Amino acid sequence: MVGNLTFRDFGVDEEEVKKVRAELRFVVNLGLITDDSLQGVESRRLAKEAETVAALGENKIVYGLSSYSRQAYIRYELTRFRLDFISEGSAVKYEYTDISEKDAIDFYEKNRDLYTRANGESFAFDEVRLIVKKKIRELEYEKNVDLLCEQL
């Protein structure tokens, strides 16, 4: 393992550093990881790679990349954490705000442009109910990350 890793080693530019730090801290708060340091990210990357190599050695089917660059891995990990939160995964330790049917319909009405077909026709709410709720969850995730950004 390499010591003294920097955000540059992970392809994170200076404008993104605060947000990436906040996201990593948030996922620690969610109980998805215990180490939000770059060394922690690197350890998880190497562990994922070793797991994949072992599975391939046993002729198991592996989905995704067999090896991650640091830049690819941090993006993969942040995306995975976001999706775990949005899908309300069982590993996530968080008290989600309730999304009522009224909240979902109101969001849908205010953001109909997000729910249109290629020809410009809107999907009916019943067709996109789950997607609307996931978008609201994603905004909740972003709000939490933004709050942590302000504290850094």
Which positions does each model-derived feature cover?
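N-terminal targeting/tethering segments
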Residues: M1-R70
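PPIase-associated folding chaperone regions across multiple families
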Residues: G57-L152
